[in-house]
């Protein structure tokens, strides 16, 4: 979503529609964790994560749009949060630090990837050995979810596509009004996997 959709991302009714706080409760964020959001946009989710991991923790907020990251920095400053690092990624590389992240979340973002294999390679490399990947995706199985079909994802699709890139699907939580919560752990990547060699571009708030 482009920067023109920023107001929609920050709409007052978003919590009642999506129960973001409930999703964050379900994924086990703890003080001191290092976490990341890929496709963080305005920071609606990333800043809520920052409050949960606290001053001893860190949130890497990734996006490919500098304008979105600027809005995120403004929002973080207004919220008094100093544990957020913005990261300008690319469509092939999230540019997250290697092997340092406990949990990476994608909220209705996976379907936007033009090169999902490359992005998942970078995400896999950024996670610690026991790190987790969490996808929130609108339920394709439910025709009542008022989202365009190509913005939805079924559990079967999520399992097949993401597991092919070195992950193992674990719990699937169906407690949200419209979205799956899909939780993956790392699995060994195939010998054909491309080694992540991206640099890190950080902008401290």
Specify the residue positions occupied by each region the protein language model found.
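A short glycine-rich, Lys/Arg-flanked "PGG" loop and its adjoining helix->strand segment in the class I
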Residues: 50-54, 117-132
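A short acidic, Gly/Pro-enriched loop at the edge of an enzyme's catalytic core
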Residues: 92-104
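Glycine-centered, small-residue-biased loops immediately flanking beta-strands
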Residues: 33, 57, 131
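Core SAM-dependent methyltransferase catalytic element
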Residues: 165, 169-205
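Class I SAM-dependent methyltransferase SAM/SAH-binding core
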Residues: 36-94
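Conserved class I S-adenosyl-L-methionine
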Residues: 132-159
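Class I SAM-dependent transferase core
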Residues: 1-36, 42-44, 74
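Hydrophobic beta-strand segment of the Class I
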Residues: 35, 104-105
